[in-house]
């Protein structure tokens, strides 16, 4: 029993250490670093998320009705890259992020999520720019790129390589385990609650569908996302509007409570925390249209392989 008790105490101490570190990073350092970086990019890029918004909408809707070329190892079209990036942003995380923000900081936390998202648009613009600029084209025409590539370019010595490796390991863990697990669990819970289908069955079906897509490589991923994402986004927006309209009599009160509560200390904390939760959870086939994973380093991989004559062509879509 002594050995078991010591092992249990050790695990509890380790868990407390993780919670302490996570609390410091999520509640203090990371939140303000992300907003600070976004603010810096916003100022230095001349409020690009405002200046380029009209062009982004024009090119996005134009791309929805324009036939894209076949994606392959040499890359994908601008719209396919955008759809792939959005598919990595829309989903469970947005709902959980907003709910967590409200629970922690009250209605005012939503305002700070808006602020985080606004400045995050400039951060994503910078991420996509660097991904396009520092992407690599192999002798066989294969295109690769992403944060690991521009991290190495920023630090051309051995330190850059070490940072790139660390980033690659961490992003693999975040995207390959945490994000996918949350999405699959949400799907399984929904089917269990609505249709009483065992989670194991749902898990097997989800895994089979994912395998089918992955086996097809970048071509199948791009082809699927460019078809599904517009429909998914439409359902997301229409569903949100239906909820708002159905509760229209409370809209004025809700908006007022958001702005009134926005400048309470607990609201500021809650908004940042909810935003981080939203980014952490939003990985999988579908994620949140209004949560952008700014600074996480996930979406640049999609933008890096866009086949464009000039990086500006892809960057004009980023604000969506």
Question: Where is each model-derived feature located?
Answer:
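Short, Lys/Arg-enriched N-terminal segments with co-localized hydrophobic residues
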Residues: 1-11
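Juxtamembrane helix-boundary/capping and inter-helix hinge elements in multi-pass membrane proteins
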Residues: 101-109, 135-145, 156-158, 294, ...
């Amino acid at each position: 029993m002594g050995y078991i008790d010591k092992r249990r105490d050790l695990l509890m101490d380790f868990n407390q250490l993780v919670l302490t570190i996570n609390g410091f990073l999520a509640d203090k350092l990371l939140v303000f670093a992300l907003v600070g970086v976004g603010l810096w990019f916003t100022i230095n890029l001349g409020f690009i998320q405002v200046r380029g918004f009209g062009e982004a909408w024009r090119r996005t809707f134009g791309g929805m009705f324009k036939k894209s070329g076949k994606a392959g190892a040499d890359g994908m079209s601008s719209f396919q890259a955008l759809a792939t990036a959005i598919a990595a942003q829309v989903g469970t995380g947005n709902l959980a992020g907003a709910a967590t923000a409200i629970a922690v900081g009250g209605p005012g936390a939503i305002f700070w999520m808006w602020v985080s998202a606004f400045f995050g648009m400039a951060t994503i613009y910078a991420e996509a720019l660097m991904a396009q600029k520092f992407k690599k084209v192999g002798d066989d025409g294969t295109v690769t790129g992403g944060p690991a590539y521009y991290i190495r370019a920023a630090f051309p010595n051995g330190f850059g390589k070490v940072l790139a490796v660390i980033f690659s390991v961490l992003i693999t863990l975040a995207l390959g385990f945490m994000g996918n697990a949350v999405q699959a669990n949400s799907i399984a819970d929904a089917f269990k609650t609505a249709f009483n289908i065992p989670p194991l069955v749902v898990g097997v079906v989800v895994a089979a569908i994912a395998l089918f897509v992955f086996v097809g490589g970048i071509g199948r991923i791009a082809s699927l996302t460019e078809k599904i994402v517009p429909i998914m986004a439409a359902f997301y927006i229409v569903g949100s509007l239906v909820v708002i309209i159905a509760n229209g009599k409370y809209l004025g009160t809700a908006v007022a409570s958001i702005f009134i509560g926005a400048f309470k200390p607990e609201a500021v904390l809650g908004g940042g925390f909810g935003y981080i939760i939203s980014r952490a959870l939003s990985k999988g086939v579908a994620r949140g249209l209004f949560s952008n994973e700014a600074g996480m380093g996930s979406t640049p991989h999609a933008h890096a392989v866009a086949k464009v004559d000039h990086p500006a062509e892809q960057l004009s879509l980023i604000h969506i």
